[in-house]
Amino acid sequence: MSKTTEFIKIGDRLVIKPQGADYDLIPGKVYDLSYDRYACDDIFKENGELSLPTKIYTSKKDEFFKKRVLTYFNNAFTDTTGVMLAGTKGTGKTIMAKVLAKESNLPIIIVDPQYPEHRLIKYFKQISTPVCILFDEVDKSFDTEKMLDFLDGLQKTSKKLVIMTCNNLHKVSEYLQDRCSRIRYLRKYTTDDNLEFLDILINDMGIKNVEEVSKFCRENIKLLSMDNIVAFLNEVKMLEDEDTTLDEIISVMNIEHVQPKGVSSEEEPIDENDKDDEDDFDIEPIDYDDYDD
C-alpha cells in the first residue's frame, strides 16, 4: 500500500497538510487579501486584472516619477521600496498607483481596508515571490504608525513594491512621511496637474471650440478633478449643437463653480422685466363685521 504524507512540520509542531494543488503567483495578475473576522482566517484569492481607462492621461511629472520608482526598484539592493501618492480625489493618484503596479510586472496584491494591521507582517513574510502591494486611502483605513512597523518588518524578505495612496497627507503619521528608507518616493497631486492635459482631453472628445471650453473650465470649475472635468465635457459634447451656453450647462450640474456676475449662489437670478406689479400682491383688508350674525 502506498503511503501519503499527511503532515508538515513547522518548527516543533506537526500540522495537517492542506489539500490542493501547488500555485505560483502570476506576474501582472491581481489578488485580493482580506480577513474573515468570524473564522479568524485570511482570504487570498485571484481578482483578474486592474481596471484602467482605455486611454490614460499622464503629465510629464507622472512619467518622470514612474520611471524613477521602477528604475530604483529594479536595481535596488534593498528588499522593499515604499511609494506614497497623496492628493484630493480625482487628481490622478489612484490611476498612477495602478499604472505603477501594472508596469512593475509583478503579482499585484490589493489589501482590503478592513485587514488587521497586526497580521500584515506575518502574512507577507511568508511570500518569497517579489510582489507589488497596494493600499488605497491609508489615511482613512489604516493606522499609519503601524504601517511603519509593517514596512520595517518587510525588510530582509523578498523584494516588494509597496504603493500607498492617501487623500490627506496631514492624517498620515509624520514618522512614516519622514522615513525615506521606508517610503522612498512621495508624489503630491493637486488639481492643477490635470490642467496639463485638459486641452488634449477636450480635443480627444471631439468638442468644438477647444480654447473656449478650456478657458471656461480653468476659470469656472472650482475643483478640477477628472470626475468633474469629464462629466462637464460630456454635457458640453451632448449639447454643443443646441443653443445652450457653457454657464447654462454647468448651472444645473453637481459641480461647484464660479457664479456668473449678477447671479447669487443662493437663489435664481430675477429678471426685472418678469417682476409682477406690487399692486398685484395687494390684499384688501377683511371687514369681519360682514360675518357677524
Regions found by a protein language model. Name each.
Residues F44-G82:
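Pre-Walker A (pre-P-loop) alpha-helix and adjacent loop at the N terminus of AAA/AAA+ ATPase modules
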Residues M1-K29, E46, T54, D178-D293:
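C-terminal alpha-helical "lid" subdomain
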Residues A76-A97:
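Walker A/P-loop nucleotide-binding motif
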Residues V83, I133-D136:
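Hydrophobic positions in the central parallel beta-sheet of the AAA+
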Residues E63, A101-P130, T144-E145:
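Short glycine-rich substrate-engagement loop in P-loop NTPases that contacts/grips substrate
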Residues A97-K98, K102, I229:
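Hydrophobic transmembrane helix bundles of membrane-integrated enzymes that assemble
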Residues Y115-P116, D139-K140, N168-V172, T190-E196:
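Conserved nucleotide-binding/hydrolysis micro-motifs of P-loop NTPases
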Residues D139-S181:
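Conserved catalytic/switch belt of AAA+ P-loop NTPases
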